[in-house]
Each structure stands twice: as structure tokens, then as C-alpha cells.
From Swiss-Prot:
InterPro entries: 4pyrrol_synth_GluAld_NH2Trfase, Aminotrans_3, Aminotrans_3_PPA_site, PyrdxlP-dep_Trfase, PyrdxlP-dep_Trfase_major, PyrdxlP-dep_Trfase_small. Belongs to the class-III pyridoxal-phosphate-dependent aminotransferase family. HemL subfamily. It comes from Brevibacillus brevis (strain 47 / JCM 6285 / NBRC 100599). GO terms for molecular function: glutamate-1-semialdehyde 2,1-aminomutase activity; pyridoxal phosphate binding; transaminase activity. The lineage of its organism: Bacteria, Bacillati, Bacillota, Bacilli, Bacillales. Pathway: Porphyrin-containing compound metabolism; protoporphyrin-IX biosynthesis; 5-aminolevulinate from L-glutamyl-tRNA(Glu): step 2/2. PANTHER family: GLUTAMATE-1-SEMIALDEHYDE 2,1-AMINOMUTASE, GLUTAMATE-1-SEMIALDEHYDE 2,1-AMINOMUTASE 1, CHLOROPLASTIC-RELATED. Its EC number is 5.4.3.8. It is found in: Cytoplasm. This is Glutamate-1-semialdehyde 2,1-aminomutase 2. Homodimer. The gene is hemL2.
Length: 429
């Protein structure tokens, strides 16, 4: 494929934008080569500036569960934009959106709209600290919750350690209040609570790990977290920025039947526009200003365009059969990818929950960040590049899952499986 114009645009961008991109994974650093510059999207496909077409499994990193340029979403945005893009004042759609989210998500009685997943998690943690009057939080290795200082923490040695900054610029004092333990490891959680339980304000977790590939919770893991946090008076926060409205209409908490105290949301909730949200029990959420003393604000929070796109997306997803179709297509895709690897004798593990799919090039069952890191990253890079040449766009990282949308067709899935076979064959020759 010719991608000459993309190469030229990336070279120019690097003069004006750090690394040439506005979010690091877009630079293709982990897979080599230059990023593809996109001109437009339509349904299940994206088209680059050089005229190439790709079946897309990135979907803007998850939000576009209806596919690109969905007619109803575009119509809603166009209608609202004609009336004004932002007012800095309440609108009727904000309440409509909040009401629908409260009806859909089991844990949410009251919800506050923000502009990103990072804002949502940052605000939820401040709320948890203010509500419990405690300082420390627990997170899990390999779970990404946005780029707020207290969440950019990696685990040290031992069962549970006080965090060390995972990025320059994160103060050690901030890191000191973040406890990191391995995902899917209840024994480590219990030991951490023995050491720090009296000062743990919250445990924040991706109920399905989505930033180390796709890593489902082991049986009993989420139930154990719920039991332990209740015992210690610690809030349980589900970060459903990725899983919310994707693995089920009510998110992972509906799928697994576990109700957290607070939930953070993003991606799908905005229908492709910048939206985040956090919500939960009324008595906790009533502590947020102006109802309570815990401050959080946003100039563009709940803006009309975002509410129109998000509301329309959730209405479409509420229609009968939506998740059954996603499940059918995603199951076929996962089956086809795994069959290809088996036929070619390639070491692999295939993880899937709903329309989140990840093929790891390792024989080791992937249950946490350490096991995810056993994947053959060099082979993945080659696989990615060959797949791109076949006209299939997957995330340019072994540690990001594929997203299936309602716009994908049976033909798209079969073409992807066929392309995957050829790409694997070349990558492992």
C-alpha cells in the first residue's frame, strides 16, 4: 500500500506536536513504521489520506460501537449544532442523558458529566477521599485509569508496595498514597488491606482489564473485592470507561452482577465526542458541589453536542438485538483468529469478553499484566504490519484489544479472518 502522504504529514506534525501525535499510542512506536493519517470513516471502515481503505477494529479506541459516521448520531449533532455549541448553562438534554444513564447502569443513582475518562476517574477518587476522609487508594498493575498523577503508578517488588512514579513529573508524595497490587490476585489484596486498610479510601479497578490487552476477571475476583471493601468501609470504584455500554448495556457490572459504590464512564457514552461521567450511590454523589463540599467543575461539561451524540448512541444500543448481534460477530471473529493460529502452530492465547477481543502471541494463559508481558512483541509488530497491508486496522499495540462494532458485517469478519491467516503466516515464517 502506498502511504506517502501519511508519511509526509507525520514528518510535518513532529515539528509542531510532541512526537507528532496528541496521544502516544497513535505514533505506532510499539509496532514500528509511521502512523496512518485518516481522512474519513464510514460504517466499519476508515479511509486514509492516500486513498487506502481499512476494516477498522480501533473504533476511535472504543467509542464508536455503532460504527463511523452513524446517520442518527450525525443528524443529532447537526440539529443541535445549529442552535449553538455550548452555553455554560443547563440544558434539557443533560437531564435526559443523566436519567438514561441512571436507568441503564445498576450502580448509578446520580451521575455527573465531565469531558473525559481521566476527568471521571480523577473526580471519583477525590470524591472517595472526601467521603471516607481517608488518603490512600488501591489500583491494579496493568489497569490504566487515565493520566492523573495518582494513577500513573507502577508496582514494586513484594506483595503490595507503596507506589513509585511511573512517569517523570509525578511527585513521590502523590505516589506514596497509591497502593499497587497484581490484577486477579485476591491474596495480595487481602495483605494490602491488612497493612493499609484503615487508610484506604477506594479500590479502583477495570472490571475487565482493557489496557493490558483484554483480561477478564477470574471467578470470584470481583466478588472478593466487593466483600473486602465493604468489610473495611472502603469504596469500590469500577472504571467502566472502556467496558461501559460495551460488554453489556449496563456494562461489566451488569454482566457479572457486582455493584460497585462508584462507576466511571467514557468512550461509548459520548458516541465519538469527548464525554466522561462518574456516578453511584446518591448519598455519596450528594457530596459533590454544589450539593456538597467536594469540588469539581468543567467549562464544557454536559455540552449540547456531546449530550446529543451520547444520548442517541445509548438509545440505539437500547434497541432489541444490539448486543446479541455484537456477541455473534465477536464470537465468530475470536473463533476464526484462534483457528488460524492453531492451523499454523502459533503459540497463542485468545481472550474475549463481548465485543472486546485480544489475540496474544503466547501460550501462557493471560490473567494479569505479568502474563500479558510474556507475549512475543516482535511477532506482534510484524503481524500488525502485514495485517495493515491486507486492509485491516487493529490497535498498534499488543496491549490493546480489538473493538467490534454494530457496523461490522459478516463479510467484514470473514475477510478479517482470511487476512489474519495471511498476516500470521508471514509474521511467523
Amino acid at each position: 500500500m502506498n502511504r506517502e502522504k501519511s508519511t509526509q504529514l507525520f514528518a510535518e506534525a513532529q515539528h509542531y506536536i510532541p512526537g507528532g501525535v496528541n496521544s502516544p499510542v497513535r505514533a505506532f512506536k510499539s509496532v514500528g513504521g509511521n502512523p496512518v493519517y485518516i481522512e474519513k470513516g464510514e460504517g466499519s471502515r476508515i479511509f486514509d489520506v492516500d486513498g487506502n481503505s481499512y476494516i477498522d477494529y480501533i473504533g476511535s479506541w472504543g467509542p464508536l460501537i455503532l460504527g463511523h459516521a452513524h446517520p442518527r448520531v450525525l443528524a443529532a449533532i447537526t440539529e443541535v449544532a445549529a442552535l449553538g455549541t455550548s452555553f455554560g448553562a443547563p440544558t434539557e438534554r443533560e437531564t435526559e442523558m443523566a436519567k438514561l444513564v441512571c436507568e441503564i447502569v445498576p450502580s448509578v443513582e446520580v451521575v455527573r458529566m465531565v469531558n473525559s475518562g481521566t476527568e471521571a476517574t480523577m473526580s471519583a477518587l477525590r470524591l472517595a477521599r472526601g467521603y471516607t476522609r481517608r488518603n490512600k487508594i488501591m489500583k491494579f498493575e496493568g489497569c490504566y485509569h487515565g493520566h492523573a498523577d495518582s494513577l500513573l503508578i507502577k508496582a514494586g517488588s513484594g506483595v503490595a508496595t507503596l507506589g513509585l512514579p511511573d512517569s517523570p513529573g509525578v511527585p513521590e508524595g502523590t505516589a506514596h498514597n497509591t497502593i499497587t497490587v497484581p490484577y486477579n490476585d485476591l491474596e495480595s489484596v487481602k495483605l494490602a488491606f491488612e497493612a493499609f486498610g484503615d487508610d484506604l479510601a477506594a479500590v479502583i479497578v477495570e472490571p475487565i482489564g482493557g489496557n493490558m490487552g483484554v483480561v477478564p476477571p477470574q471467578p470470584g475476583f470481583l466478588e472478593g473485592l466487593r466483600e473486602i471493601t465493604e468489610k473495611h468501609g472502603t469504596l469500590l470504584i469500577f472504571d467502566e470507561v472502556m467496558t461501559g455500554f460495551r460488554v453489556a448495556l449496563g456494562g461489566a457490572q451488569e454482566l457479572y452482577g457486582i455493584t460497585p459504590d462508584l462507576t466511571t464512564m467514557g468512550k461509548v457514552i459520548g458516541g465519538g465526542l469527548p464525554v466522561g461521567a462518574y456516578g453511584g450511590k446518591r448519598e455519596i454523589m450528594q457530596q459533590v458541589a454544589p450539593a456538597g463540599p467536594i469540588y469539581q467543575a468543567g467549562t464544557l461539561s454536559g455540552n449540547p453536542l456531546a449530550m446529543a451524540a451520547g444520548l442517541t448512541t445509548l438509545q440505539e444500543l437500547s434497541k432489541p438485538g444490539a448486543y446479541e448481534r455484537l456477541e455473534k460477530m465477536s464470537a465468530r471473529l475470536a473463533e476464526g483468529l484462534a483457528d488460524n493460529a492453531k492451523k499454523l502452530g502459533i503459540p497463542h492465547t485468545l481472550n474475549r469478553v463481548g465485543s472486546m477481543v485480544c489475540l496474544f502471541f503466547t501460550e501462557t494463559p493471560v490473567i494479569n499484566y505479568e502474563t500479558a508481558k510474556t507475549s512475543d512483541l516482535e511477532r506482534f509488530s510484524a503481524y500488525f504490519s502485514y495485517l495493515l497491508e491486507e486492509g485491516v486496522m487493529i490497535p498498534p499495540s499488543q496491549f490493546e484489544g480489538m473493538f467490534v462494532s454494530l457496523a461490522h458485517t459478516d463479510e467484514d469478519i470473514e475477510r478479517t479472518i482470511e487476512a489474519s491467516y495471511q498476516a500470521m503466516k508471514k509474521a511467523f515464517k
